[in-house]
């Protein structure tokens, strides 16, 4: 009994000692969060049928505020360690000065300010994947041959909101930044920065009408070109890129209506950068020319408020801006929220891919997503 009493007194003294230690304010503002996306997908393409379970995404983040600064670090864990496209990697690492609403300054690695859909959390985006044009022209599995960068790059950005109406709601948002142009976790190759920016108006609550622009380059330093195999000198090849996007969205009362058109002018490397040797391959992809574009239109409608949603999307991408190379997807499905942190998504897609001998095939996708 005496031992128990002594132990209890010691525990009390230790606890009291810790209680007197005042931790820095910023420690109390640090938050651990993350999300996971599990997936089943079946593809019924002729002579290429597949069905598989998959971990689409698993991310863990730390973020917090100290004074006027907000910071975030996020890591993606799923994938293998053999390719850049699916290896575990840092996706976000930035700090932003947020003293003024009309002027916030961000530096580090973060989302490129291009299109409405790119900066969205993939669970909130609502479908089995981002729109094809967003994937190909905003830095995911990019048309230019860059490694998978989840729409991100390293740089510095200014953004802000202003022109408040009588209700105190801002009517105008802008964002503009300078970036390396090489995607995540990569230094610049050609010392030419990408200038990317957007501006949108919000005439009524829930509505955004925006325009985005992007000018810059994607470059490689290497010594192999299939079009000139005898030239083994190490050299830098720069591919100029010019892109723009027109975007519209209305989101209110559980409804989401969104559409975007994206166009790109600029050549592409033939081999996608997946491993170190790919970065030295300077061969140009002449098969898709120097233009590409696409667009999508989607609707998400509440069936049971905050619980069950019906959705549909029309999604088109043309790798060379010609209709005879178009890949069109007609999608419909349902999203169900078990709780605010657990969501089940299911959809059917009819695909018309004019790049294939057999244009038409179907897909089924189901995802169970969770947040913490």
Regions found by a protein language model. Name each.
Residues 46-47, 94, 109, 118, ...:
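Outer-membrane beta-barrel pore domains
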Residues 38, 112, 185, 214, ...:
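Short, electropositive, low-hydrophobicity segments enriched in small/polar residues
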Residues 21-181, 189-196, 200-209, 296-302, ...:
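Outer membrane beta-barrel
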Residues 15-19:
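Sec/Tat signal peptide C-region and signal peptidase I cleavage site
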Residues 4-5, 61, 262, 315:
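Residue-level detector of intrinsically disordered/flexible regions characterized by low predicted structural confidence
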Residues 180-184, 230-233:
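Surface-exposed cleft-lining segments at the edges of enzyme active sites
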Residues 4-13:
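Sec-dependent N-terminal signal peptides
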């Amino acid at each position: 009994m005496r031992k128990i009493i002594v132990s209890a007194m010691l525990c009390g003294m230790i606890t009291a000692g810790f209680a007197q230690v005042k931790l820095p304010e910023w420690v109390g503002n640090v938050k651990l969060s993350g999300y996971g996306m599990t997936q089943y997908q079946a593809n019924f393409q002729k002579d290429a049928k597949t069905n598989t379970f998959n971990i689409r995404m698993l991310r863990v983040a730390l973020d917090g505020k100290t004074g006027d600064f907000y910071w975030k670090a996020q890591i993606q864990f799923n994938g293998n360690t053999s390719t850049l496209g699916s290896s575990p990697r840092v996706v976000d690492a930035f700090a932003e000065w947020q003293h003024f609403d009309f002027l916030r300054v961000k530096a580090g690695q973060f989302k490129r300010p291009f299109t409405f859909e790119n900066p969205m959390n993939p669970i909130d985006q609502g479908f089995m994947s981002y729109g094809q044009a967003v994937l190909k022209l905003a830095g995911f599995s990019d048309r230019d041959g860059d490694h998978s960068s989840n729409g991100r790059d390293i740089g510095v950005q200014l953004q802000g909101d202003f022109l408040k109406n009588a209700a105190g709601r801002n009517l105008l948002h802008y964002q503009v930044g300078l970036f390396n142009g090489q995607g995540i976790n990569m230094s610049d190759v050609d010392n030419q920065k990408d200038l990317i920016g957007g501006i949108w108006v919000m005439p009524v609550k829930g509505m955004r009408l925006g325009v985005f622009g992007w000018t810059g380059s994607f470059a490689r330093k290497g010594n192999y070109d299939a079009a000139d195999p005898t030239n083994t000198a190490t050299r830098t090849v720069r591919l100029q890129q010019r892109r723009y996007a027109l975007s519209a969205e209305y989101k209110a009362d559980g409804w989401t209506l969104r559409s975007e058109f994206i166009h790109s002018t600029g050549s592409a490397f033939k081999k996608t950068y997946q491993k170190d040797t790919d970065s030295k391959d300077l061969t140009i992809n002449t098969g898709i020319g120097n233009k590409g574009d696409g667009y999508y239109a989607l609707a998400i409608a509440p069936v049971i408020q905050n619980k069950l949603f019906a959705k549909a999307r029309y999604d088109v991408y043309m790798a060379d801006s010609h209709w005879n190379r178009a890949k069109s997807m007609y999608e419909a499905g349902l999203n169900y929220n078990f709780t605010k942190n657990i969501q089940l998504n299911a959809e059917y897609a009819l695909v018309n891919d004019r790049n294939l001998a057999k244009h038409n095939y179907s897909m089924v996708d189901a995802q169970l997503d969770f947040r913490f």
